[in-house]
Amino acid sequence: MAELVVALDFPAADVAVDMAGRLRGTAPWMKVGLELFCAAGPDVVRAVADLGFRVFLDLKFHDIPNTVRGAVRSAVRSGADMVNIHLMGGERMARAAVEGLHEGAQTTGSVPLLFGVTVLTSTAQGELPGISTDIGEYAASLAASGAAWGLNGVVCSGYEVESIKKRCGASFLCLTPGIRPGGGAGGDDQRRVMTPAQAVSAGSDYLVVGRPVTGAADPAAAARAIMAEMAAVRR
Amino acid sequence: MAELVVALDFPAADVAVDMAGRLRGTAPWMKVGLELFCAAGPDVVRAVADLGFRVFLDLKFHDIPNTVRGAVRSAVRSGADMVNIHLMGGERMARAAVEGLHEGAQTTGSVPLLFGVTVLTSTAQGELPGISTDIGEYAASLAASGAAWGLNGVVCSGYEVESIKKRCGASFLCLTPGIRPGGGAGGDDQRRVMTPAQAVSAGSDYLVVGRPVTGAADPAAAARAIMAEMAAVRR
C-alpha cells in the first residue's frame, strides 16, 4: 500500500513542527529537507519523530565515501527513518552509506531505509553536465546500480517507476516527489509531475506532497483527501 | 597568499569545538562537514565562528534549484563564510545557489564565498556513472561552467589547479582537499593528494588539512608547521 510523505518545506523549526502537529493522524511520514535542516539541525528530526511520525531526512548526500558513511551514521542517530544519497556518487560511496546505516542503527535499534537519488526530478534532458544519454535510461541504469549496491530503493519520477520495478524487482522501493493533486505544473522546479492516483497506478511506494498539503486552508483535510485518492486505486 | 583550512572531522560538537579552541591563533579557517553538521546542526557553525574563525560549511548541496536556494540561505544565516554545491547539479541549481547566497547575506551583512565541487577527490577514472571522458577534463569543464554561473571558485585536486586557473582566470579561487604533509596516501578516501608546498606551488588558494593536524600530538604546532611550509613557497 503506497504511503504519503508530507514535505515540511519551511525555513524554521517552529513553523515546521507546528504544521506536523496539525497533521497528526493523517500522513504517516514527514520529510525534512535541506533548507529546514540547515536552519534547525537534528533537533527538528527528533521533534517531528516525537509527534509520532516516521521521518524522511532528505539531504541527498554526495561526498567522499568516508564522509557519507559518517553523515548517514549521524542522520540515523538523529532519529531519521529514511535517508538518501546521490547514486552519481558511485559504488564506493553507496556501499559506505550502507555501512553507516547499520552503524547508526546499532545506537537506535532499527535500520532505516536508504534511498538513492537517480536524476533530480527538476532536471530536464540536456541539463546533466557531461551526460548525453537519454535521461530516463540514465536514471534506470543508476537505479539498477543502487539495487546492486544494497540500497532499499530510489527517488524517481513517477514516469520511471515501471521500468525501474521491471529492472530491479517489485520489492525495490520507489519514492516519487513532485506529486500534485490534479496534476499540472505547480510553478516550481518539478518538471515531471503526477497526480496521486497516477503515481500509485504507476507502482510508486511513497508519494511526496508539499505545498498542496502544507499550503492548503485545511492541511489535514488536504492530506486525508490525497490518502483517499491513493487508497481508491486498485493495483 | 594561500590559507589553511582545518577540517573538524568529528562526530560531535563538543570534541570539534574543543579542537577549534586549541587551534586559536593558527589557521584562519575551520571546516564543518556533513558528519559533524548532521550530528550538531547550525549551532556548531556559530560556536566555531564565535572563537574567531572563518567557517567553511562543506555540505556539497545537490538538490532541486529551489531547495538549494533555501539551503544556501539557511547556511549563510548560520554564520558560514564559505559554502559549496555540486556543479553536476547544473546551471539552474547553481544560479539558484547564488541567489540564496545574496538573500542570506541580507541578514548577515556579508556575502560568503560560494564554491563548486567538480569531481570528488576520492573519485578515480571510471567511477563516475555515465561519464567516460577524462576525469581531469570533465572537472575543468565543470569548473569553467561554475565560473560562468557566478561562483567564486571550485573544490578540486591540486593536480587540476593549473588548468582551471588557465581556463577560468587567476581570480577564480581553488580550494584543495586531501593535503598531506609529506604527501603519500593517508589510507583514507583521497586519491589525488599533495603536500602543502606542492599545492601552494600549483596555485591553490585554500588548503584543507584534517587528520594530520587534528590527529597530531600537538595540533597547534602541526598547524603552524604547515603554515610555515606554505609561506616558504615563492609564487
UniProtKB/Swiss-Prot annotation, chains A, B:
Entries under Pfam families matching the protein = OMPdecase
What's the name of its gene? Answer: pyrF
One GO cellular-component annotation of the UniProt record comes to: cytosol
What PANTHER family does this protein's entry cite? OROTIDINE 5'-PHOSPHATE DECARBOXYLASE
Q: What Gene Ontology biological process does one annotation of this record name? A: 'de novo' UMP biosynthetic process
| Residues annotated as binding substrate | 9, 31, 58-67, 121, 180, 190, 210-211
Disulfide bond entries: none
Q: How does it assemble?
A: Homodimer.
Q: Which PROSITE patterns match?
A: OMPDECASE
**Origin species:** Nitratidesulfovibrio vulgaris (strain ATCC 29579 / DSM 644 / CCUG 34227 / NCIMB 8303 / VKM B-1760 / Hildenborough) (Desulfovibrio vulgaris)
Q: What family is this protein classified in?
A: Belongs to the OMP decarboxylase family. Type 1 subfamily.
Task: Identify this protein by name.
Answer: Orotidine 5'-phosphate decarboxylase
Which NCBIfam families does this UniProt record tie to the protein?
A: PRK00230.1 (NF001273), pyrF (TIGR01740)
